[in-house]
Amino acid sequence: MDRVFFTNSGGEANEGALKAARRYAYTKKTGRYEFIAMQNSFHGRSFGAVSVTGHDSYREPFEPVVPGVRFAEFNDLDSVKALVNDKTCAIILEPLQGEGGINLATQEFMEGIRKICDENGILMICDEVQCGMGRTGNMFAWQGFGVKPDILTMAKAIGNGIPVGALSLIHISEPTRLQLIS
């Protein structure tokens, strides 16, 4: 992680990650724009972030939300595979869900998501707003799985009480990375 884009909050970091994924697909001329998110997830209260949040109670008051978002069961690779299509640009997940209970991704699930993304040209977004910054024993939860995401979001603990968030485009080449966040 050699470059970080700072934001005002975790929700804004996730909003930036969604925009970066769509911009990446646009730049690569893939025609992809859809997202797969997980049930019981929480990604923020901005319009894009609430659109990929896996709780009806957060989304319903703002419907219609961003189109092209489908929800898979957390820790169920078959559920994710069933949703992948030629329009999927990214899969967003929290390695450790906090809003839907303390749900930890399995090793098999994280490795499977990375494989699905690699085989289908899909970006993997890890939302570590709640679980990052040493809260799982590693600096970031993904490190414990040995599964590196393409985009990483973080907040809360990085500010030590000051509202700040950030996103990093990890596996995206330099020229494309600059286009996505400039």
Question: Model-derived features: where do they sit?
Answer:
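Active-site PLP attachment segment
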Residues: 138, 144-173
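PLP-dependent aspartate aminotransferase-fold enzymes
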Residues: 1-90
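Short acidic, glycine-rich surface-loop motifs adjacent to enzyme active sites
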Residues: 88-102
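Catalytic PLP-binding core of fold-type I/II PLP enzymes
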Residues: 85, 103-137
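Short acidic, glycine/serine/threonine-rich loops at helix termini
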Residues: 16-19, 45-51, 102-103, 134-139, ...
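Single conserved hydrophobic/aromatic residue that forms the stacking wall/gate
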Residues: 170-182
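Generic enzyme active-site microenvironment
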Residues: 17, 92, 125-126, 148, ...
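Active-site nucleophile and cofactor-binding loops and adjacent substrate-binding regions
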Residues: 5-12, 130, 155-159
